[in-house]
């Protein structure tokens, strides 16, 4: 979370450092293990740990192939090895991410809304998101929207057409 002048919000950064401390060594090991699993299965993957301001946040893995189903196979093996305790999984197309449970847009939005209400009182909140995981913060909003071809829109369309 950033302050209005674009600088790091130290209070929020401190909260995140506390929430993520147990994952700081685990995330690089998880990234390496996921890439090795892909290699063992015969797939070309790339991956990294997303880090900002000296704090490791989550693991991202993508494939270099033509079939997004590859990541589902890699995920199944990572899960079978019990490597994701305390983590959320975000899988969407060529994107497989492992996020510690203390890292969630919802928590940041809750904090931002709390601060905003202190300064400006209660006011309407609009939310915009494109993935199913965005629903975690979007339900804090009075109204929300999603792009027509997003993962979220496709999921809603599938539910309507069932």
Model-derived segments and spans:
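Short, surface-exposed, polar/charged, turn-prone segments marking secondary-structure boundaries
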Residues: 18-22, 86-88, 116-119, 153-156
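Active-site phosphate-binding/coordination module
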Residues: 1-39
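Short, polar loop motifs at secondary-structure junctions
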Residues: 129-133, 148-151
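Conserved acidic, metal-coordinating active-site core of Asp-based
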Residues: 30-126, 132-140
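Asp-based, Mg2+/Mn2+-dependent phosphohydrolase catalytic module
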Residues: 119, 139-162
């Amino acid at each position: 979370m950033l302050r209005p002048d674009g600088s790091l919000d130290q209070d929020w950064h401190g909260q995140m450092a506390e929430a993520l401390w147990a994952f700081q060594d685990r995330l690089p090991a998880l990234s390496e293990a996921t890439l090795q699993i892909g290699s063992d299965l015969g797939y070309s993957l790339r991956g990294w740990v997303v880090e900002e301001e000296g704090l490791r946040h989550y693991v991202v893995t993508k494939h270099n192939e033509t079939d997004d189903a590859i990541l589902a196979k890699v995920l199944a093996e990572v899960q079978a090895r019990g490597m994701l305790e305390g983590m959320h999984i975000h899988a969407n197309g060529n994107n497989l991410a492992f996020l510690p449970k203390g890292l969630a847009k919802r928590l940041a939005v809750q904090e931002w809304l709390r601060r905003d209400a202190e300064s400006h009182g209660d006011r309407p909140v609009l939310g915009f998101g494109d993935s199913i995981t965005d629903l975690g913060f979007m339900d804090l909003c009075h109204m929300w929207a999603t792009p027509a071809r997003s993962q979220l829109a496709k999921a809603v369309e599938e539910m309507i057409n069932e």
